Amino acid sequence: MSRIGKKPITIPAGIEVTVNGTLISVKKGNNVSTVETHGRVGIEVANGQVILTRNGDTKESSAFWGTYRALTANAINGLHEGFTKSLEINGVGYRATLKGDILELALGYSHPINYEIPKGLEITVEKNIVSVKGADKQQVGQAAAIIRGFRKPEPYKGKGVKYTDEKIIRKAGKTSKK
């Protein structure tokens, strides 16, 4: 069992955390992030920390305890620092351009792929690197996964869209018979 729920979450300066029943609201300026928790978890804000407690000793309450602690920490960290995922585009003629709030990708198909950037996310393009930034960790990861899914990297030449820290396992091509 992980016991990650035991760790208190330190609230950074400039972040305001309020609890209303089972709803945790994290606020910084005009940005608000909310986490809907389960009744099996108790929430307390004191001394600049958020402390989550289990309501009961069941296996489910332990699972919810760690999950909601992680979700709350992600909401606080997202508004404080933000999350970033970087993608690398490899291939001849493969490129990405920004046109307003649309990311246009040329990935070897007969047509360009237009991806509408969701609200709350910021996408930047530098040469062959596409960076997805935002306050919601789930939304940043989902957008990066969708962009990667347009042309996953293939194992023979490594062409496609991959995460910058992703390792592509390369395969050897066919060998000729003599």
UniProtKB/Swiss-Prot annotation:
Gene3D superfamilies, alphabetized: Ribosomal protein L6, alpha-beta domain
List, alphabetically, the SUPFAM superfamilies matched: Ribosomal protein L6 (SSF56053)
What are the leading ranks of the lineage? Bacteria, Pseudomonadati, Campylobacterota, Epsilonproteobacteria, Campylobacterales
Question: Tell me, what is an example of a GO biological process annotation in this record?
Answer: cytoplasmic translation
Q: Which UniProt keywords apply?
A: Ribonucleoprotein, Ribosomal protein, RNA-binding, rRNA-binding
Q: What is this protein called?
A: Large ribosomal subunit protein uL6
Protein source organism: Aliarcobacter butzleri (strain RM4018)
Q: What molecular function does GO assign, one term? A: structural constituent of ribosome
How it assembles, according to the record, is: Part of the 50S ribosomal subunit.
Spell out the Pfam families in the cross-references. Ribosomal_L6
Q: Which family does it belong to?
A: Belongs to the universal ribosomal protein uL6 family.
Q: What does this protein do?
A: This protein binds to the 23S rRNA, and is important in its secondary structure. It is located near the subunit interface in the base of the L7/L12 stalk, and near the tRNA binding site of the peptidyltransferase center.
Q: Which GO terms describe its cellular component?
A: cytosolic large ribosomal subunit
